[in-house]
């Protein structure tokens, strides 16, 4: 059994590789003649192959012709070729006679294929068009000449009459038709003229020949499997008792199987219809021969040309068929566990993309420029945690109203001049300033004198009186140096006077400040371990007395800033006194003028 299966598989593979079959093999496989549509297709395709240019026969060489159906070869793609063989007949020597002989031999081969398997006493009935084509192809030019001679003889006898004239006209028409069909091109024209659209004749006849080739291969595969099954049954029959089914299968011969196959193909073509005629567009070409029954069935399935019947179980349609597909999908979704809400889902952070060169350049542009720190050489001495003091030395002034003295001498930082942006006061504030001015100056000093006189500065309270008493106690302990310190203290100006604010107006203060600065520097330089105790104690008391009273003349309070701003605003308002309307609007607050001044709060700002 395995051997038979292997052999059938090998036969199927070998037949799948077959590319051509002769017309005689096709007839032997079916054991019956071909149909008319297949005859038209074989004739047309064979004439198309014979129409190709061939070497012209030499007058002394024998002509070529088609002997039998075995000389007609069918190919898998629907082409048909002819194997030409030499003919000993040398009656015709021109090209037209050679074509006529070739057409005549083709007609004889086609007629034998149509008459295959019939007895000599039987004759197949053909359609008028096909019968006329076969007669003209087989008759050749001799038929027309004989008829022409017979008509001439009848004319010579001198018979006349209306009936005889009509018969002569019909004979002339048939004679003209018989004389015209002597070439392959004329046969192809006649084969194409029978179709509704002659232009589609090559495609239609090629499809018919291709279907004939494929059906023959399928039949041969089927017959080979039947043969293998018979052999297998014979082996089984030898081992087991004979059964009726095996006897019936044995009775069926090769011809019977072939007829059953042909009958099945016919029923598939004509009996089984999956489509309605009115739903299909009219196609004049007989498509039932262009495709195999299996290809027709697959084409109908692909195009959905069928109507499905309702499935009934126990007389009722099942519930799964009644329900809508959408409802089934919803039920399936509901049966699944509930999904997590989107708000509760936590997605991982997106991967950080590498920063492009353009973004890097923009980031560097947006960043502040880092300036290189510059250390200035300074011989200043750190004063520990003493209160904020302003340098009175002209050479070391860095325009700061408050200096941090807790920094060590080695790491002294460069001080920068602090500039404060003061906004212009409103009219209400200006009125309040005027009231305060009247209270401060009851004698009615004029505006110019107020502008020239500075505001007295208050004492810095960061250095308490208790610290001052302690310093004085230490100074009183040393009596020899006390007189010098007292003299130095007597020379010190009062803290609430106006001499420390504007140094440019009082040169004496400037000289004293420079001398004080020099005394401090000399005190630093003279502090060596080899000096005498008296000079050391004197310098120490001088230093303590110098810084007992912090820089009261250099500290600018808020009241002083307000006074300066008030003076500046009044000076600015004097510009608009000529325009009374504008001045009144400014005073009432209807018009606002933005006044901004940069005031340098330092001893050298003046």
UniProtKB/Swiss-Prot annotation:
UniProt GO molecular function: actin binding; microtubule binding
Spir-box: region residues: 554-574
InterPro entries per the UniProt record, alphabetical: KIND_dom, Spire, WH2_dom
Domain WH2, chain residue ranges per copy: 263-277, 357-374
Family matches, as CDD domains: WH2_Spire1-2_r3 (cd22186), WH2_Spire1_r4 (cd22080), WH2_Spire2_r2 (cd22079), WH2_Spire_1-2_r1 (cd22065)
Keywords for the protein's UniProt record, in alphabetical order: Actin-binding, Cell membrane, Cytoplasm, Cytoplasmic vesicle, Cytoskeleton, Membrane, Protein transport, Repeat, Transport
Chain intervals for the UniProt region annotation (Disordered): 147-181, 438-464, 517-537
GO cellular component: cell cortex; cytoplasmic vesicle membrane; cytoskeleton; cytosol; plasma membrane
Family membership noted in the UniProt record: Belongs to the spire family.
Protein name: Protein spire homolog 2
Organism: Danio rerio
Gene label: spire2
């Amino acid at each position: 059994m395995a051997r038979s299966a292997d052999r059938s598989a090998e036969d199927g593979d070998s037949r799948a590789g077959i590319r051509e079959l002769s017309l005689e093999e096709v007839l032997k496989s079916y054991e019956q003649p071909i149909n008319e549509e297949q005859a038209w297709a074989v004739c047309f395709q064979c004439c198309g192959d014979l129409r190709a240019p061939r070497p012209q026969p030499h007058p002394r060489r024998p002509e070529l012709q088609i002997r039998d159906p075995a000389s007609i070869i069918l190919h898998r793609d629907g082409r048909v070729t002819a194997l030409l063989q030499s003919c000993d007949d040398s009656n015709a020597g021109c090209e037209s006679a050679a074509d006529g002989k070739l057409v005549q031999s083709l007609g004889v081969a086609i007629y034998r294929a149509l008459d295959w398997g019939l007895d000599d006493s039987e004759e197949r009935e053909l359609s008028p068009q096909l019968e006329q084509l076969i007669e003209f192809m087989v008759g050749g030019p001799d038929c027309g000449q004989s008829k022409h001679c017979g008509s001439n003889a009848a004319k010579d006898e001198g018979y006349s009459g209306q009936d005889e004239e009509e018969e002569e006209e019909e004979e002339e028409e048939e004679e003209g038709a018989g004389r015209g069909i002597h070439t392959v091109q004329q046969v192809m024209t006649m084969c194409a003229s029978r179709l509704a659209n002659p232009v589609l004749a090559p495609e239609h006849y090629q499809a018919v020949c291709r279907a004939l080739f494929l059906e023959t291969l399928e039949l041969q595969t089927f017959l080979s499997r039947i043969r293998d099954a018979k052999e297998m049954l014979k082996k089984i029959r030898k081992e087991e008792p004979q059964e009726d089914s095996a006897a019936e299968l044995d009775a069926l011969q090769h011809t019977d199987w072939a007829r059953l196959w042909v009958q099945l193909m016919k029923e598939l073509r004509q009996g089984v219809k999956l489509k309605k005629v009115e739903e299909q567009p009219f196609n004049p070409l007989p498509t039932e021969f262009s495709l195999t029954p299996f290809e027709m069935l697959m084409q109908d399935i692909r195009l959905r040309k069928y109507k499905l019947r309702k499935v009934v179980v126990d007389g009722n349609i099942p519930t799964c068929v009644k329900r809508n597909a959408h409802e089934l999908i919803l039920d399936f979704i509901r049966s699944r566990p509930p999904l997590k809400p989107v708000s509760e889902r936590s997605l991982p952070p997106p991967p950080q993309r590498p920063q492009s060169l353009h973004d890097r350049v923009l980031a560097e542009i947006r960043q502040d420029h880092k300036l290189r720190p510059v250390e200035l050489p300074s011989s200043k001495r750190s004063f520990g945690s003493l209160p904020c003091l302003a340098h009175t030395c002209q050479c070391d002034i860095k325009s700061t109203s408050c200096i941090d003295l807790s920094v060590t001498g080695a790491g002294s930082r460069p001080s920068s001049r602090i500039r404060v942006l003061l906004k212009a006061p409103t009219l209400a504030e200006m009125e309040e300033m005027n009231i305060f001015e009247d209270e401060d100056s009851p004698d009615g000093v004029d505006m110019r004198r107020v502008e020239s006189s500075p505001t007295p500065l208050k004492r810095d309270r960061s250095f308490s009186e208790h610290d001052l008493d302690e310093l004085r106690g230490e100074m009183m302990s040393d009596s020899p140096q006390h007189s010098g310190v007292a003299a130095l203290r007597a020379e010190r100006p009062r803290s609430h006077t106006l001499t420390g604010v504007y140094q440019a107006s009082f040169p004496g203060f400037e000289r004293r400040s420079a001398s004080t600065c020099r005394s401090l520097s000399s005190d630093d330089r003279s502090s060596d371990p080899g000096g005498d105790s008296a000079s050391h104690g004197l310098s120490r008391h001088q230093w303590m007395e110098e810084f007992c009273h912090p820089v009261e003349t250099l500290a600018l309070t808020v009241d002083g800033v307000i006074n300066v701003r008030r003076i500046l605003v009044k000076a600015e308002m004097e510009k608009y006194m000529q325009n009374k309307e504008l001045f009144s609007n400014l005073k009432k607050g209807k018009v606002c003028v933005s006044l901004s001044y940069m005031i340098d709060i330092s001893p050298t700002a003046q």
